[in-house]
């Protein structure tokens, strides 16, 4: 079966690099599915789970806090603002971040505070959703 090279990188590290049969990730307008031979594309991605169906049939999950996706017919590159392997996600930490962002929303004093709180809340909620999705796969 045809495969596509997938690289998921953040400013800190390369999180995943390998051959895959399929990649699904959160785009601006909804979930994107990428197969080998996909039309070239550059777009922003939203906070959420990147699901990589590997060549051997296994799956890899990576949480991204947004970033840029570049697709070429035989290569997918995810340049993430922040990327965390699914196995390294911390539910307690994500829940606390969500609670703190909700509190910040209640106490915001400027448009900048509001935008920051909304952004942090979106990332925390997406991280919790990714954790729940990963649990369902186990």
UniProtKB/Swiss-Prot annotation:
Pfam families listed in its UniProt record: ATP-synt_DE (PF00401), ATP-synt_DE_N (PF02823)
Chief subcellular location: membrane
Superkingdom of this protein's organism: Bacteria
Transmembrane regions listed in the UniProt entry: none
GO cellular component, one term: proton-transporting ATP synthase complex
Molecular function GO terms recorded: ATP binding; proton-transporting ATP synthase activity, rotational mechanism
InterPro entries: ATP_F1_dsu/esu_C_sf (IPR036794), ATP_synth_F1_dsu/esu (IPR001469), ATP_synth_F1_dsu/esu_N (IPR020546), ATP_synth_F1_esu_C (IPR020547), ATPsynth_dsu/esu_N (IPR036771)
SUPFAM superfamilies the record matches: Epsilon subunit of F1F0-ATP synthase C-terminal domain, Epsilon subunit of F1F0-ATP synthase N-terminal domain
Protein topology in the membrane: Peripheral membrane protein
Keywords carried by this UniProt record: ATP synthesis, Cell inner membrane, Cell membrane, CF(1), Hydrogen ion transport, Ion transport, Membrane, Transport
Membership in a protein family: Belongs to the ATPase epsilon chain family.
Function: Produces ATP from ADP in the presence of a proton gradient across the membrane.
UniProt protein name: ATP synthase epsilon chain
Organism: Cupriavidus metallidurans (strain ATCC 43123 / DSM 2839 / NBRC 102507 / CH34)
């Amino acid at each position: 079966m045809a495969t596509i090279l997938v690289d998921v990188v953040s400013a800190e590290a390369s999180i995943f690099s390998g051959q895959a049969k399929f990649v699904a990730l959160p785009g601006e307008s909804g979930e994107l599915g990428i197969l080998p031979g996909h039309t070239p594309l550059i777009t922003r991605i939203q906070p959420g789970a990147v699901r990589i169906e590997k060549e051997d049939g296994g799956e890899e999950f990576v949480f991204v806090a947004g970033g840029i996706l570049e697709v070429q017919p035989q290569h997918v590159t995810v340049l993430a603002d922040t990327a965390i392997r699914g196995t390294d996600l911390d539910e307690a930490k994500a829940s606390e971040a969500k609670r703190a962002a909700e509190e910040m929303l209640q106490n915001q004093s400027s448009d900048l505070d509001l935008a920051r709180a909304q952004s942090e809340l979106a990332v925390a909620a997406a991280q919790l959703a990714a954790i729940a999705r990963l649990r369902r796969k186990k």
